[in-house]
């Protein structure tokens, strides 16, 4: 099992290219199930979750080509993948595939829309909370689906096809919004979704579906109106830059000091994050090619800032762990409140192993900033927690070994290579 070794204390200097957003690529790939024609997606990152979803889609009969070449067995190393679901060969999504990634459950929407039936295992993924699929299932019922759950599988049927309806999400859910949009685009009649997620990744999906012939209005807002169409066409869409990756590297620069350009990062997707990082003392300049970051830790100390996670455009839960790592070296006390997931502080114990001083009280972590962190062996517990340990290790004295980095490979493309090119002492160890 791979691990990553880091010797801290080096400033970061250079250019970090920001990859396509995994959280945007996954629903776009699943949308290929909605059309017989080819959906071409540019800027897809090379990640374990992408590879897994390719296998899942292939299980349903979706062919794919990388820059015009078929590849049914290996993870791709290219920016463009062409997906063609000319015929859905099965509506069955088995446990051995779906259990590895929660987003794979989203195939239930397109399968119901196109085949009027889906038999999908309940999902897996990072163990950071229950993330119930109840909102998705209740929403699909509103569109006319008959749903039963048996032996860990959801069996959904709609013999006469889905019908437009009005549905209000009890709580903002990105995954639920993705599924309901994809289910409703070819439903008979009008669907109105209230309290919908308005993350940039949702907007990316809406724009893609409209390019395929859907009729969706309200993009970027919490109310989406969908006029069902009979069929969707193929299209070519670019995956948006990964705002979570960009925010992660911005926090790394804030932690170590240095001078880094985040190439292709979209600052409009990170408005609150950048404002908060400026309050910590990071110098940020928006340029045509991306986001330019500077920090001289001898001149500007890391200032403590309180944050509370929330649905977009609030501070993203996917950057909470990374920001906590930054706050471990702040000149004072900060408070971090998590409102999205109920179990997303598993990184606290590992950060404390590096010398951090963090105390938990329910959904709030109090971080007592310390001048120095000390390298030590630590264990990644989930995707975002794992990268928070990397950020802390970059500033810690001595060597840190981050174990179970397969979590990192699910969401960060060539992380150690990007950091090493900016001067970090970091390497992957394969046992």
Curated annotation (Swiss-Prot):
Protein name as catalogued: UDP-N-acetylglucosamine 1-carboxyvinyltransferase
Binding site for phosphoenolpyruvate: 22-23
Similarity section: Belongs to the EPSP synthase family. MurA subfamily.
Compartmental location: Cytoplasm
Involved pathway(s): Cell wall biogenesis; peptidoglycan biosynthesis
CDD domains tied to this protein: UdpNAET
GO cellular component entries: cytoplasm
Keyword Cytoplasm attributed: yes
């Amino acid at each position: 099992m791979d691990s990553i070794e880091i010797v801290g204390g080096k400033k970061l200097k250079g250019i970090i290219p920001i990859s396509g957003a995994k959280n945007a690529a996954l629903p776009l790939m699943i949308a290929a199930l909605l059309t017989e024609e080819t959906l071409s997606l540019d800027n897809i990152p090379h990640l374990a979750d992408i590879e897994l979803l390719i296998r899942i889609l292939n299980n349903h009969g979706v062919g794919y080509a990388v820059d015009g070449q078929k590849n049914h067995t290996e993870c791709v190393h290219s920016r463009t993948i062409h997906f063609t679901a000319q015929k859905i060969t099965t509506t069955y999504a088995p446990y051995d595939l779906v259990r590895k990634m929660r987003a794979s459950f989203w195939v239930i929407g397109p399968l119901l829309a196109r085949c009027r039936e889906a038999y999908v295992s309940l999902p897996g993924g990072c163990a950071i909370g229950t993330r119930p699929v109840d909102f998705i299932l209740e929403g699909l019922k509103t569109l006319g689906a008959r749903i039963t759950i048996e032996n860990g599988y959801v069996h959904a049927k709609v013999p006469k096809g889905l019908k437009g309806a009005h549905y209000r999400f009890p709580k903002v859910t990105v995954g639920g919004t993705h599924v309901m949009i994809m289910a409703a685009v070819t439903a008979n009649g009008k669907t109105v979704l209230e309290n919908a997620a308005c993350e940039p990744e949702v907007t990316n999906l809406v724009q893609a579906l409209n390019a395929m012939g859907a009729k969706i209005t309200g993009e970027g807002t919490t109310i989406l109106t969908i006029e069902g169409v009979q069929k969707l066409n193929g299209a070519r869409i670019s995956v948006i830059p990964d705002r979570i990756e960009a925010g992660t590297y911005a926090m790394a620069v804030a932690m170590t000091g240095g001078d880094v350009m985040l190439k292709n990062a979209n600052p409009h997707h990170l408005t609150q994050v950048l404002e908060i990082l400026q309050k910590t003392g990071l110098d940020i300049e928006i340029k045509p090619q991306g986001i330019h970051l500077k920090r001289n830790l001898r001149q500007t100390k890391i200032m403590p800032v309180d944050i509370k996670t929330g649905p977009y455009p609030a501070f993203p839960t996917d950057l909470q762990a990374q920001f906590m790592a930054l706050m471990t070296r702040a000149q004072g006390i900060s408070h971090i409140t998590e409102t999205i997931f109920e179990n997303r502080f598993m990184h606290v114990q590992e950060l404390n192993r590096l010398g951090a001083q963090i105390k938990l009280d329910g959904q709030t972590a109090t971080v007592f900033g310390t001048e120095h962190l000390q390298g030590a062996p630590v264990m990644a517990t989930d995707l975002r927690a794992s990268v928070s340990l990397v950020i802390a290790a970059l500033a810690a004295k001595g060597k840190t070994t981050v174990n179970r980095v397969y979590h990192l490979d699910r969401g960060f493309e060539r992380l150690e290579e990007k950091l090493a090119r900016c001067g970090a002492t970091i390497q992957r160890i394969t046992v």
